[in-house]
């Protein structure tokens, strides 16, 4: 371990090395590249607050603060915020949020060569373009409750336990992991409306499963044939 990561303090007895593990040093930059490609291929982006989903005869419609848009088919892929829309469609999906925290130490990415996870304490540290990112913890806290400052403090203390003295952290952030009781996402059509599709609830794996979920949903909308069994991911499983 010392040969791989000489800056980790020698508190450990051993570890597991994932030889082919990969990580993105700047996920936002990758997503912006994909977004630019989407626009170049004719995609349109409107930034508005969705207030409701209703219907114009049999076509789904999105109501915003100022406009109403009517579609042939519609996808709800709003992560942890999807439940607010599915509830309005009379579909009670037990989506909750696993809130996770991160703390950012600017200019310290040179201290580690790769992501390191300390499973006993439930946190990890990743070298990013912007510095060291310390992440971890899980709490079911919904969308409205304030952040738990104690969890941020624990991340800072754990990072110093692993790496020694660190400068004052630059940034704190809390995110919402969209989670379901069976740890499977919801992918596929609404049980009540055949022209509304769902893609959410990917828990800790949104970055990993987002691309394949998008491919599956686009195939459904285009009515392509598939040999995939998607029943385990249907919203029907919740009654």
Question: Where are each of the predicted segments found?
Answer:
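C-terminal lid/capping helical subdomain adjacent to the catalytic/cofactor pocket in oxidative enzymes
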Residues: 8, 191-239
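General small-molecule cofactor/ligand-binding pocket signal
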Residues: 2, 44-46, 170
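Active-site catalytic microenvironments for nucleophilic, acid-base chemistry
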Residues: 37, 41, 88, 216, ...
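Helical element adjacent to the flavin cofactor pocket in flavoenzyme catalytic cores
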Residues: 9-73
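Alpha-helix N-cap/helix-start capping motif
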Residues: 28, 79-80, 211
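Hydrophobic/aromatic beta-strand patches that form the interior of the parallel beta-sheet core
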Residues: 46, 75, 197-199
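Active-site substrate-recognition segment that forms the wall
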Residues: 52-55, 59, 68-195
